[in-house]
Design a protein with these regions (language model features):
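C-terminal accessory/interaction regions of large nucleic acid-associated machines
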Residues: 14-105, 127, 565-602, 616-854
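Pre-P-loop entry segment of helicase/translocase ATPase cores
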Residues: 88-149
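Conserved C-terminal RecA-like helicase domain
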Residues: 124-136, 142-143, 148-150, 154, ...
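SF2 helicase catalytic motif II
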Residues: 240-243, 249-290
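SF2 helicase motor core recognition
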Residues: 242-249, 453-458, 468-483, 509-518
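Conserved interdomain linker/interface between the two RecA-like ATPase lobes of SF2 helicase motors
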Residues: 280, 289-400, 442
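Conserved segment of the helicase C-terminal RecA-like domain
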Residues: 287-292, 480, 484, 490-542
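C-terminal helicase module of SF1/SF2 nucleic-acid helicases/translocases
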Residues: 512, 517-612
Length: 854
């Protein structure tokens, strides 16, 4: 922070003015009781605008926040003059906040006339600054950017490796996608990879690319896509798991650029280690690959610029651009008045009294506080996001808000009715979302089908859903801004209180840039130390510590793990040890070189000690070396023990997986899970649960609708004399599909299948049955390559399976599936309404891509 910034921000009169603006802005957004609605003293806009003007050249967060606070406060004030509002617009111009200017003009068209009437040197200065804050695209088009976006573009254009960090609302996603689009539209062929932490973000990002690019550019999200090699220009939007699989399927795959979104996830356990591993493999294949990282609120983005690399052109940057003001508000019950809650704004390290609200009902349990407070403050307005600790709590919160809004009329909207129909068709007719949506209330958590979550997000952004209850999936990078965010005792996982860096990442969703001037974060029961062991205060940045670095920081522990036999992870053995061992063993077996590992800096003596330990155990492996690298995260020693067990059985052909359509599939997959649980690991305990999981896995691969799987489990429970609660049952089935069928089962069963196949080869046995691509069938929940092709071009699993009876060829390519969608007469098919709508919508997208191609 510069001396000028320090001097201006330390002015008592200026600080007091900022506090007045902040308190007034919250009061304007909240339905306070009558005693607290009297107008506050109007700030001295002339003085505040002058101070803010002096701060516009400053790049630090405090100065940026103050400039934005003054400008937006002035624009929202009913008592500021035309000249003052014009000056406020000029402030926004000087800091490159064009969306806020557009919003102000939309709300008050007279502002433009005020600027023209008050033309001065300030106007010329703002125009000069606006010209500075632009980027010229390869097409010659010019886009307006903010200071962070301008800096990113300059660094990415001049360096091979770049790592940036900025607040959630700084426009990272937009500028990075524009930069990638520019790379794809350049003069030379380009192959780009966008690594996203979740499948939800994969879908969101890939849709953006498809909407911006013509069909001469390949946009791929699946490693099984047979048309991957058919484009000179292509972008792959993948999770680290899918990129790893693509590496194994295409040994010569070498992208020119890899972008890692939400790069702080490199610190998250085994998935963080896998992210490090796929980056290491990409660099091993092509040392000249360009890497770009982006993370929110990271203090040390430079840690991702691997010091062991030979690249000299590197740059790290911590951006502090503020685009939307955020108000942190504490909400606590007024003593002896259970219906009344006091609000206090945290600003400048102090709590400022805002006023009181009254709830329609007194919460009879703690779990009703947040939804009732949200309903009291949000009313019929849009953009209300409510945080819940888990799927069950999310549905309960949504039910409470739904009940609190019982006097409000139902929302009459075709889009809402389509969501109702879709949720019943894709999940189950008893899924509660269908009921709540008609009153403008939705919920969203990780285990819900991807396409349904996307539709919920879309309706929330459009204001058709006024309230959305979400879990920590919001921390995974999904772009879902809001006007108000409500939360109490937020957790990360089932037990751990949410760390402050994660809280601020979540809080960054408050404030819809270009839609609202500010966002509000309402923290409930902050006086309860059990709910809030650490009260939120000033926004904090976190330090990134890659999981691989953390695990290998204790070399002795790793060597002891190897010498003890490198068994599967359990209560005594962290899974990070097993994952790191797999990575190191794969590197060692394939070339023996552990030098230059990406993301890990080891001393020569440490590298030698690990190599010696690996040298003691790897000669005992009869396992094919390629299987070690292929099955990331699984101990090679565990694979060897499985191989020994299959060889001891003597009949590997009898243990081979069968196609999911086989009549004996349930029993065969149960046997496979028995072997997996004993030798490889996974969440397949207790043994009594494995037949149920085998049935789930087989049904999922067969493409059985989720509703049928749910009804089958309900029927089984009734036959066992157990009661059935549909909300709970639906959540359990969706969790099993996501956690077991789509994540753990493909990881472990594909490894099992490969080991069994090797055993058969050793014994000279013929494998009579080909089960197909287990990983594809499990992750996508479909049995045929044709189904995969339909999904790869944009259809959901539900629609893909709905049309399966009309598409008999099991081996259609994506191009053939595209042609089918474009030519089919949906009115001639007996399809569910949601499936027919999706096909028509996809056809329109294809048409738009061809139109862009000219």
């Amino acid at each position: 922070m510069s001396q000028l910034s320090d001097r201006v921000l330390s002015l008592t009169r200026f600080r007091a003015g900022l506090e007045e603006i902040a308190v007034s802005s919250v009061r304007a957004d909240v339905p306070l009781l009558g005693d607290f609605t009297s107008p506050t003293r109007e700030p001295d806009w002339g003085f505040l605008l002058a101070c803010a003007s002096a701060l516009t050249p400053e790049s630090n967060e405090g100065a940026q926040e103050a400039v934005l606070r003054v400008a937006q406060g002035c624009l929202r004030s009913s008592q500021s003059t035309d000249e003052q509002r014009a000056a406020a617009i000029l402030l926004l111009d000087r800091v490159g906040n064009q969306p806020a200017i557009a919003l102000a003009r939309d709300r008050d068209e007279s502002i433009l006339a005020s600027i023209e009437a008050n033309s001065s040197a300030l106007v010329l200065d703002a125009l000069y600054r606006r010209a500075e804050l632009t980027v010229t695209l390869p097409s010659g088009d010019v886009i307006e950017v903010n200071p962070f976006q301008k800096k990113f573009w300059e660094l990415a254009s001049a360096n091979d490796w770049v790592s940036v960090s900025a607040p959630t609302s700084a426009g990272k996603s937009y500028i990075i996608r524009e930069w990638m689009l520019a790379e794809l539209r350049g003069a030379t062929p380009a192959r780009l990879v966008y690594i996203a932490p979740t499948r939800a973000l994969v879908e969101e990002v890939s849709e953006v690319f498809r909407s911006k690019l013509d069909d001469s550019v390949g946009v791929h999200t699946l490693p099984w896509d047979p048309e991957i090699t058919g484009f000179e220009r292509q972008v792959f939007v993948l999770t680290q798991e899918r990129l790893h699989l693509l590496h194994q399927r295409l040994p010569q795959f070498t992208p020119s650029v890899i972008f890692v979104d939400e790069a702080q996830k490199i610190a998250d356990g085994t998935r963080g280690i896998l992210l490090t591993q796929v980056l290491d493999e990409a660099i091993r294949r092509d040392p000249n690959v360009r890497l770009v990282f982006a993370s929110p609120l990271s203090a040390n983005p430079g840690v991702l610029l691997d010091s062991a690399s030979s690249h000299e052109c590197k740059a790290a940057f911590v951006g502090e651009t503020v685009t939307v003001n955020q108000n942190l508000v504490f909400v606590n019950q007024v003593p002896r008045k259970p219906l009344r809650y006091s609000l206090s704004l945290v600003y400048g390290g102090n709590e400022q009294d805002v006023g009181e609200i009254e709830l329609p009902l007194a919460p009879d349990v703690v779990g009703k506080k947040v939804p009732l407070i949200a309903a009291a403050i949000g009313g019929v307005s849009t953009g209300n996001l409510v945080f819940a600790n888990g799927p069950a709590e999310a549905e309960k919160f949504a039910r409470t808000i739904f009940d609190a809004l019982r006097d409000d009329p139902a929302i009459e909207s075709d889009a809402v009715e389509e969501l109702v129909d879709f949720s019943k068709g894709v999940v189950h007719e008893r899924f509660q979302l269908a009921e709540f949506a008609r009153r403008g209330v939705g919920f969203h958590y990780g285990d819900m089908p991807l396409v349904l979550k996307a539709k919920v997000e879309e309706l929330f952004k459009r204001g058709k859903l006024r309230y959305l209850v979400c879990t920590s999936t919001l921390l995974e990078g999904v772009n879902l801004p809001c006007r108000n965010l409500f939360l109490r005792a937020p957790r990360k996982g089932p037990r751990m209180h949410m760390p402050m860096p994660d809280f601020w990442n979540l809080a960054g969703r408050a404030g819809r840039w270009g839609t609202e001037f500010q966002g509000n974060i309402f923290c409930v029961d902050t006086s309860d130390v059990k709910a809030w062991p650490e009260k939120p205060g000033r926004r904090k940045r976190s330090s990134i510590m890659p999981a691989a670095t953390m695990t290998l920081s204790d070399i002795t522990r790793m060597i002891e793990y190897i010498d003890r036999g490198a068994h599967k992870a359990d209560r005594e053995t962290p899974p990070e040890l097993e994952s790191s061992f797999n990575w190191l063993a794969g590197r060692f077996i394939s070339g023996g070189d552990l030098a230059g590992l990406y993301g890990v800096t080891l001393r020569v003596d440490e590298t030698d000690r690990i190599a010696e330990a690996l040298g003691r155990v790897t000669p005992t492996l009869r396992l094919r070396p390629d299987l070690v690298k292929k099955h990331a995260g699984i101990s090679p020693m565990s694979m060897q023990r499985l191989l020994d067990a299959v060889l001891a059985n003597g009949q590997p052909e009898e243990l081979a997986l069968v196609p999911p359509t086989s009549d004996d599939a349930f029993e065969e997959y149960k046997t496979a899970l028995d072997y997996v649980a004993e030798y490889l690991g996974g969440s397949f305990e207790p043994e009594s649960r494995r037949l149920s999981l085998a049935r789930l896995i087989v049904h999922w691969m067969r493409g059985v609708p989720l509703s049928v799987i749910i009804d089958n489990r309900a029927r089984w429970r009734r036959n066992q004399g157990q009661e059935v609660s549909y909300p709970k049952l639906i959540r359990q089935v969706m969790a099993d599909v996501e956690d077991i069928a789509r994540f753990e089962a493909p990881r472990y069963l594909s490894c099992y299948a490969d080991v069994v196949a090797q055993a058969a080869g050793i014994l000279g046995r013929q494998m009579e049955v080909d089960a197909g691509d287990i990983e594809m069938m499990l992750e996508l929940g479909v049995p045929r390559p044709t189904d995969m092709s339909f999904i790869s071009v944009g259809l959901s699993r539900a629609t893909t399976r709905a049309i399966a009876e009309f598409v008999l060829d099991p081996f259609l390519s994506p191009a053939q599936c595209t042609a089918w969608i474009e030519n089919v007469d949906v009115e001639q098919l007996e399809l569910p309404a949601f499936a027919a709508r999706e096909i028509v919508a996809q056809r329109q997208l294809f048409s738009e891509r061809r139109w862009r191609a000219g």
